[in-house]
């Protein structure tokens, strides 16, 4: 069985192949999310604590959290669930998934280091994998570099070098939610537009109410005139 161990602190991961079944027996009958002491796997993992995060069986079917079985099962899967990505809106599909209980039929078991042990693991805990991209949002850039609101975040955005043919240039992401004079001007303009539209609507409503009152008074006067004529004709 292969153990795909990740170390989120350094952003690194490494696969260890273990042929001796007695060493991996400690994982059997454990579920996704449970923690396991690494000393039972080998002396190099002494002091380490691993959390089971997933895996695949020998046919490539992924383990699914919440399925309390050590075998494969077919489930009707929908949007926003693991092991399935719908291609159309509202699409559902019955797919085979492996249960969340670890067994000997697994080819790869994914583990996360929760607690670091005594000695370093070569290529895993002794190396740091830098993030390829830096923060993009203005507030996150400020938080990342410890800037105040007065500092210009555009000077601190992380640029990366790109080589195209013989030409080398730098690229930087577009800073999101950056407050600039243009943005404030646009906001003021939109607010003024809103106020202007509301004022125009109020004026139009007042004009309509005035016209309606005029029409109603005219109709009332007409009806009163008709009643007066009718009363005078009856008297005659």
Curated annotation (Swiss-Prot):
GO BP field: maturation of SSU-rRNA from tricistronic rRNA transcript (SSU-rRNA, 5.8S rRNA, LSU-rRNA); translation
Glycyl lysine isopeptide (Lys-Gly) (interchain with G-Cter in ubiquitin) cross-link, chain position(s): 116, 131, 149, 214
Note: Present with 66000 molecules/cell in log phase SD medium.
Pfam name, any one: Ribosomal_S6e
Function: Component of the ribosome, a large ribonucleoprotein complex responsible for the synthesis of proteins in the cell. The small ribosomal subunit (SSU) binds messenger RNAs (mRNAs) and translates the encoded message by selecting cognate aminoacyl-transfer RNA (tRNA) molecules. The large subunit (LSU) contains the ribosomal catalytic site termed the peptidyl transferase center (PTC), which catalyzes the formation of peptide bonds, thereby polymerizing the amino acids delivered by tRNAs into a polypeptide chain.
Assigned protein family: Belongs to the eukaryotic ribosomal protein eS6 family.
Gene3D superfamilies noted in UniProt: 1.20.5.2650
Name this protein carries in UniProt: Small ribosomal subunit protein eS6A
GO cellular component, one term: nucleolus
Gene from which the chain derives: RPS6A
Disulfide bond residue pairs: none
Domain of life according to the entry: Eukaryota
Transmembrane domains' residue ranges: none
InterPro entries from the UniProt entry: Ribosomal_eS6 (IPR001377), Ribosomal_eS6-like (IPR014401), Ribosomal_eS6_CS (IPR018282)
Subcellular location: Cytoplasm; Nucleus, Nucleolus
């Amino acid at each position: 069985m292969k153990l795909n161990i990740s170390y989120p602190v350094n952003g690194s991961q490494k696969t260890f192949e273990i042929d001796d079944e007695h060493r991996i027996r400690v994982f059997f009958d454990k579920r996704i999310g449970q923690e396991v002491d690494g000393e039972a796997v080998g002396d190099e993992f002494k002091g380490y604590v691993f959390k089971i995060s997933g895996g695949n069986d020998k046919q490539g079917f992924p383990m699914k959290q919440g399925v309390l079985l050590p075998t494969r099962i077919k489930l009707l899967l929908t949007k926003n669930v693991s092991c399935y990505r719908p291609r159309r809106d509202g699409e559902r599909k019955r797919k085979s998934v492996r249960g969340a209980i670890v067994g000997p039929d697994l080819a790869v078991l994914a583990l996360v280091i929760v607690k670091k042990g005594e000695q370093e693991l070569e290529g895993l805990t002794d190396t740091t994998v830098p993030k390829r991209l830096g923060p993009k949002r203005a507030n996150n850039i400020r938080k990342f570099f410890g800037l105040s609101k007065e500092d210009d975040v555009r000077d601190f955005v992380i640029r990366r070098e790109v080589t195209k043919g013989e030409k080398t240039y730098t690229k930087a992401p577009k800073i999101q939610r950056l407050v600039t004079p243009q943005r404030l001007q646009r906001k003021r303009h939109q607010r003024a537009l809103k106020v202007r539209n509301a004022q125009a609507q109020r004026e139009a409503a007042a004009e309509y109410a005035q016209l309606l009152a005029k029409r109603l008074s005219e109709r009332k006067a007409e009806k009163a005139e008709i009643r007066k004529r009718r009363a005078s004709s009856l008297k005659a």
